[in-house]
């Protein structure tokens, strides 16, 4: 296909138009008085959202050159979302501010490579200063504050704080759609996996149709148990001790299953058999997790272990096990805290190294099950459209809260970026005149989020920013109440990781845009090159 090429000023101008179209759409959502954007879908009702990355991803411009500019800004938002889970609108506003100011200087004759060096120098200094002024998250109230600011809802903030308190900071918190209109939290403690009993005759509670085992032994194996003789010595020892048994195996079939059921019905001993969770390598990893959690050993040919040689001290133990037809929950595993902590660190490293979203999700699930449980926030709303919008907001709030736990928090409402600007202005220098220009561009851009929040609240952004530059650290403009106050004390806080990621990604994409000298895009198809239309049979085709 033929290509169209634009150079220097023409190229940058086309990219800037795309940047502005996307950023002007996204930035209307910033702050407590930001508006919503309606997104058309190919079918069904349109989506209504104020989630920056969702809006950015949905924008596709007709002009190829402008679309490239828009897609680059969208990438800054997407990267921020991937790293911190929030801050996408801030990243978009910062990108636009740096690009606009940079383009003016490049047009006036400044060298874009020098400007880029200055942008990188100033961004590094700003990030270092952000870390210096960051507060660590230590209480449940602080977690609730972060979540409340991100979701614009105290109710959601408290729900997320409750969930984190119950399952720990590493625990998995999933967000599901509720069938009702209320948003509520439920928590599954301990390790749960989606495999139920192999026979309903194993239940101990006929009303609930579930099997409860108190202080059971747990046999963990990746083998199939078909011959009862393989585990008979083990069963005899367990019966002598008057204990119950949970069997987690590849499968239990042949004569083994009916023999176990018969002994259960006769009251010889309490036993429940379930299939091992997962498939392939993931199954092996999950069985190893269960073994570490319960202090047992996986009886596997990979380790040279056979069922018939299994000793009772190779079995795991737990305080309580509950098995339904669909799931097994192990609570109070008897594994050593050191072994569990070591396994948790190992999984965290795998999460950091993986490039697959699916693998990351599965690893996080395993991490949560080892770290203490799974919390489920069920989102309710009156309509499908409202439900989707609430779900987006709660997901953002959850991501923001995790980010705050990781790197701490700073004053919200764009105040921290202006505080950083005040601290480093005059101390950060470029190594040339053009680099110095790059430093000044970043300094000016740091005030862009505050300006936009004020404008979305119907105020003059320049006036608010000027006032803020003369205020004490952490004192900012609360757009929700139209007051000047200490943002941290008022509970208006942003995760440091979110603010940092937004600035770093904005500076990175903006610097690339400014140093662009040529843009190549598909040439628009000419009408004369298109195939002629088929003749209409109803026009002059009669005999």
Curated annotation (Swiss-Prot):
The record's Gene Ontology cellular component field reads: cell surface; cytoplasm
Q: Which CDD domains match?
A: GroEL
- Pfam families (alphabetical): Cpn60_TCP1
Q: What is its EC number?
A: 5.6.1.7
GO BP terms? aggregation of unicellular organisms; positive regulation of interleukin-8 production; protein refolding
- What is the predominant subcellular site recorded for this chain? cytoplasm
Listed binding positions for ATP are 29-32, 86-90, 413, 478-480, 494
**What is the enzyme's main class?**
isomerase
- Organism's domain of life? Bacteria
Q: Which HAMAP family match?
A: CH60
PANTHER family, alphabetically?
Answer: 60 KDA HEAT SHOCK PROTEIN, MITOCHONDRIAL (PTHR45633)
* Name of the protein in its database record: Chaperonin GroEL
Taxonomic source organism: Lactobacillus johnsonii (strain CNCM I-12250 / La1 / NCC 533)
Q: What is the lineage of its organism?
A: Bacteria, Bacillati, Bacillota, Bacilli, Lactobacillales
